[in-house]
């Protein structure tokens, strides 16, 4: 039984030319390329722009100007403004870190401090108060009648799960025990990774962080500008309650529809299996490099694997249709 991530509601060419725009986005020029409502519980939020009432910029203002030029800037403007007003020193510090990154060769990243930040962020996850949005401590029994399926086969449970969520605006999957065990074991040693989401103007990077059987995602720009206050924009919930008896793990998701639609969330969710469940050492090697040798990590390797897998093809087609 293969695990296929579904959403209710061919290999692609490798990258030919890249222009580094900012730490969270790479615009790529190449030949033509081929999840659920969020409950605000563990929702964190994000990033700013020049405007009246804001603290003065640096000497040349280049850091702020570059940030405003970010294609995704408008999406995070209010949160960035909030950070700039409430803690100007922290805001300037984050701009300086971005400037340091820009001095590195395109495709390379100095991630040591970033990994440390993500580890601290994970420790803080369980301490955050429940708020509107994501569901805290979500269990299988909260979304599914476990008693009803005790006498069902794995295939019957799979059909029930798929039928139930196919009518909902969400991402869901039924993962075979062997595949989940592989993902889970690898997540214990490599709990953090980076996914690339195709956008009209390039790719936006999302950071994934395991906390228990939940996998939280947030845009890289959020972490750069908000640090520990960065909010989860997508959470994948894995339910292992039936793993030993039925040989399957059920998965569903919640997302912040302000930032992600279902097709985008599905693209991110599929990359979990692409990088964590692969039998190709070079692909999982990217995850290991990100966690253990961050200074050697290349952002563009993630994009290259995503393109070769074809996982972003549907999203690209939808974006191209929107253009017309």
Curated annotation (Swiss-Prot):
Q: What is this protein called?
A: ATP synthase mitochondrial F1 complex assembly factor 1
Cite the GO molecular-function annotations of the record.
protein-containing complex stabilizing activity
Keywords, A to Z?
A: Membrane, Mitochondrion, Mitochondrion inner membrane, Transit peptide
Q: Its biological function?
A: Has a complex stabilizing activity in the assembly of the mitochondrial F1-F0 complex.
Source species: Mus musculus
- A GO BP entry: mitochondrial proton-transporting ATP synthase complex assembly
How the protein assembles, per its UniProt entry? Interacts with ATP5F1B; involved in the assembly of the F1 component of the mitochondrial ATP synthase (ATPase).
The primary location reported for this protein is: mitochondrion
Reported phenotype of the disruption mutant: Mice lacking Atpaf1 are viable. Though it is not essential for embryonic development, its deficiency leads to growth retardation and lactatemia respectively in young and adult mice.
Q: Indicate whether Amino-acid biosynthesis appears among the record's keywords.
A: no
Q: Where is the transit peptide?
A: 1-54
């Amino acid at each position: 039984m293969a695990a296929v991530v579904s959403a209710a509601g061919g290999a692609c060419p490798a990258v030919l030319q890249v222009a580094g725009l900012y730490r969270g986005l790479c615009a790529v020029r190449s030949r033509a390329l081929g999840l659920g409502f969020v409950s605000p519980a563990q929702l964190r939020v994000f990033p700013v722009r020049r405007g009246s009432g804001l603290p003065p910029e640096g000497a040349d203002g280049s850091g702020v100007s570059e940030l405003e030029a970010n294609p995704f800037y408008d999406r995070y403007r209010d949160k960035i403004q909030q950070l700039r007003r409430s803690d100007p020193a922290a805001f300037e510090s984050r701009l300086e870190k971005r400037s340091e990154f820009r001095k590195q060769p395109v495709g390379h990243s100095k991630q040591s401090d970033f990994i440390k930040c993500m580890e601290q962020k994970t420790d803080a996850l369980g301490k955050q108060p429940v708020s509107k949005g994501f569901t805290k401590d979500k269990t299988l029994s909260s979304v599914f009648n476990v008693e009803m399926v005790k006498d069902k086969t794995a295939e019957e449970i799979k059909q029930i799960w798929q039928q139930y969520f196919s009518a909902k605006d969400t991402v869901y999957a039924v993962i075979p025990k062997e595949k989940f065990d592989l993902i889970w074991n690898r997540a214990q040693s490599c709990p953090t990774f980076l996914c690339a989401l195709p956008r009209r103007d390039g790719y936006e990077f999302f950071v994934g962080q395991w906390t228990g059987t939940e996998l939280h995602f947030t845009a890289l720009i959020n972490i750069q500008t908000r640090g520990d206050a960065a909010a989860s924009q997508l959470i994948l919930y894995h339910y292992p309650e039936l793993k030993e008896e039925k040989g399957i793990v059920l998965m569903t998701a919640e997302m912040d529809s302000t930032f992600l639609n279902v097709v985008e969330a599905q693209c991110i969710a599929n990359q979990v299996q692409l990088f964590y469940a692969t039998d190709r050492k070079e692909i999982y090697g990217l995850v290991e490099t990100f966690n253990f040798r961050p200074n050697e990590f290349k952002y563009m390797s993630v994009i290259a694997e995503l393109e070769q897998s074809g996982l972003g093809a549907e999203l690209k087609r939808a974006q191209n249709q929107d253009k017309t």
